[in-house]
UniProtKB/Swiss-Prot annotation:
The gene is tsf. It comes from the Bacteria. This is Elongation factor Ts. Keywords: Cytoplasm, Elongation factor, Protein biosynthesis. The lineage of its organism: Bacteria, Pseudomonadati, Pseudomonadota, Alphaproteobacteria, Rickettsiales. The keyword Transferase does not apply. SUPFAM superfamilies: Elongation factor Ts (EF-Ts), dimerisation domain (SSF54713), UBA-like (SSF46934).
Amino acid sequence: MKVGVEAIRELRQITGAGLGDCKEALETCSGDMEKAKVYLREKGLSKAYKKSHRDAADGLVAVRVEGDKGAILKLGSETDFVARNEKFRSLAAELVSSLLKHGAEDLSSFSASPYDGGSGVSVADEVVNAAAVLGEHVVLSGIGFLELGGPGVIGSYIHGAVGEGIGRAGALVALEATTAKTEALLEFARQLAMHIVAAKPESVSVETLSNDLVEREREIVAKQVEALGKPESVASKIVDGRMQKFFEDMVLLEQTFIMDGSTKIRDLLHNKGQDLGCEVRIVAYRLFSVG
């Protein structure tokens, strides 16, 4: 099967594999992008097992925290020109404020809720109206809402800020802690949110990581190791070692804290708990980025 140059380039951008390898993968998989990714992984030519948090060509991420609640959303645009437009920024800010107020946890219910900007229409209709004014496609492509169920804090971080709480990437993280809301705990939550933006974990713990994702990765790793021709006892240890590295990349608690490059997040939580005299636990997080 003949595949297009654009598809080859897209696969290369996603996987980091060579152009020739990407062409071979797409031809072998009849142009199926997802199957081609797996093909390259099995050949040991790609490490692209993380899902993308960027499904819009451009746009902005907006985040807002008030007390024990936090909201985050991704507003997509076709170009950077529109993303820098003041009306687009204002829309993102107004939408995230509305999300914080309504506390919606899924995109469809929030889109159907009343827009709080005074226009008397739904959130979805306001986005359509904005697109007409701005002259290109605008899409509300993701939302996140966190609310504490007990003592703790919610931290946030925006990367590439273009305004207060608005930028190119952002994260919310909810921490459970029985101590009072100290500046130290709030700063710790902010640092964790910063880490999440940089490290892009897929789950809080190994237990909450998708079973399908884990099994698919184990199958891919097993095929890679099988090609080495090692004895079964040795191959099994190699598979376990590679899976541990997989977890260290994908799981927040297993990741190494970006700000010191040595401490695992789970150990960081333990250390902070000792400093504060209480247990500190990550309840949940939300992450979005564009561009």
